[in-house]
């Protein structure tokens, strides 16, 4: 699973998440409410509408924001940084100091003070791509970090669903994979996602093992200690502490985590 893994490193104090293999995938499906507006604090492609007062570009409205984030989620690396905000009327009241802090945030991977702004009422700050050890991870702030782990739940469930859809040919001369129609797998339960959240404080890697070790009626992920290093190759499995096994049972349609 050299290039097929998920890396997560969270800071429980600042609610910042550094991830590889998740990023903005399923963000708009996971959050309870899609943001009203986005302020683009780093915008190399000049996307959105230009605001004369703050000199930033913005994206307005739930549907426009949803389309923007979903499009960004499909990029391998994202160079646009953004922060959400509730009301344009409060956005227009930003002080020079607050605008300076937003400019600083756009040029760095860390806020000058906090990644929250009272006048914006933001729930998220998307820092874009960072490169620890030359690996393109995504860094993001969540007011409620459980929003990220709901995203992770969708990523894990989709991985299992896609694996079930791919029916390998029984004979070598049949090289074409047959795609089956299967029901979408549910995401793991809240207690399991909360447990993964706690483990991620130390940095974790999640690998997909499929049915190799558990039989045809189950699919397995393994969770390893990774600390602050997103690099992970097959040989690292013998070197890293195994936190546990996350399995999905096709018969009962349930998830289970065993340490």
Residue map of PLM features:
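Structured alpha/beta or helical-core interaction and ligand-binding surfaces enriched in interleaved
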Residues: 1-259
């Amino acid at each position: 699973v050299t290039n097929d893994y998920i890396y997560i490193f969270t800071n429980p104090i600042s609610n910042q998440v550094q991830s590889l293999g998740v990023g903005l995938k399923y963000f708009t499906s996971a959050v309870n409410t899609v943001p009203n507006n986005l302020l683009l604090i780093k915008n190399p492609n000049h996307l959105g509408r230009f605001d004369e007062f703050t000199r930033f570009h913005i994206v307005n409205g739930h549907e426009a924001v949803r389309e923007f984030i979903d499009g960004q989620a499909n990029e391998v690396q994202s160079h646009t940084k953004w922060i959400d905000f509730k009301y344009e009327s409060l956005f227009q009241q930003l002080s020079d100091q607050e605008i300076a802090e937003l400019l600083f945030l756009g040029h760095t991977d860390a806020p000058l003070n906090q990644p929250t702004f009272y006048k914006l009422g933001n729930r998220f700050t998307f820092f874009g791509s960072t490169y620890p050890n030359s690996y393109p991870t995504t860094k993001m702030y969540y007011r409620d970090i459980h929003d990220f782990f709901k995203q992770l739940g969708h990523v894990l469930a989709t991985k299992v669903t896609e694996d079930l859809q791919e029916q390998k040919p029984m004979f070598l001369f049949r090289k074409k994979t047959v795609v089956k129609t299967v029901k979408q797998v549910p995401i793991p339960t809240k207690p399991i996602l909360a447990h993964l959240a706690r483990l991620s404080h130390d940095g974790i890697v999640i690998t997909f093992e499929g049915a190799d070790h558990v039989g045809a009626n189950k699919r397995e992920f393994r969770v390893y200690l990774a600390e602050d290093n997103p690099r992970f190759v097959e040989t690292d499995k013998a070197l890293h502490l195994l936190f546990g096994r996350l399995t999905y049972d096709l018969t009962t349609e349930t998830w289970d985590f065993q340490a």
